[in-house]
Amino acid sequence: MGAETMESPSLFLCKGLLLTASLLICWNWSTAALLTSKEMRFSAAEGAKVLLSVPDQEENLLSFSWYKGKDVNENFTIAHYKKSSDSLQLGKKVSGREEIYKDGSMMLRAITLEDTGFYTLQTFKAHGQQEVTHVHLQVYKIVTKPYLQLNHTRLKRKSASILTCVSPDTGVDINWFFNYKPLNATERITLSPEKRELTISPVWRADVGIYLCEVSNSFSSKKSYPLLMALAYG
């Protein structure tokens, strides 16, 4: 019976890295397999372009492949580049919006919410070095411009007024403005739990003016057109 070979221990490190779009990078180094495993995170707004770039890839680079998802599998190949022949082969998961660069980076153009997920870069370098980088892309929705609705077109003093911030977006933050300054809630001026409705009861002369609402998420914000609230007399 042959002698058993003891597998070399691996070292796992996880360190924060501050980049323009990257949030986290971790790596797992195995001296036995000369294999390095990393994870990076990027975020961008829908409709934009984003460069998925892994640092320090160009030196001693022989070839690399990009995959859709976390599996290194031919069926999920986006593209494969071979330096010796300067050739680029497209795979089954190419969408036509990719640009592949010789340093191993990949540009995605006109990204959509469906592009959110993992991408994997596999690189082969001199001396048998292999590196696998899992890149997570988070695509954020650009919010839609909201608009204001008023429950009555003719308001009278001491009546109740309800303004509604209308937006098709969900999971957003809503802020209100009066005469272009942040509006503070009071006993008379209250907000619904999701802040989509602003109720003024009773309406006073001091409430006459311009109202706006703003819808925002982590990546974008938009304000409604101003609405002038006035009182009717007689």
UniProtKB/Swiss-Prot annotation:
Protein name listed in UniProt: Cell adhesion molecule CEACAM15
Keyword Nucleotidyltransferase attributed: no
CDD domains reported in the protein's UniProt record: IgV_CEACAM_like
InterPro entries in the record: CEA_cell_adhesion, Ig-like_dom, Ig-like_dom_sf, Ig-like_fold, Ig_I-set, Ig_sub, Ig_sub2, Ig_V-set
Tissue: Detected in placenta.
Record: glycosylation sites: N28, N75, N151, N184
Limits of the Ig-like C2-type domain: 146-226
Coiled-coil blocks: none
S-S bridge residues: C165-C213
Keywords of the record: Disulfide bond, Glycoprotein, Immunoglobulin domain, Signal
Signal peptide start and end residues: 1-32
GN (gene name): Ceacam15
Family membership: Belongs to the immunoglobulin superfamily. CEA family.
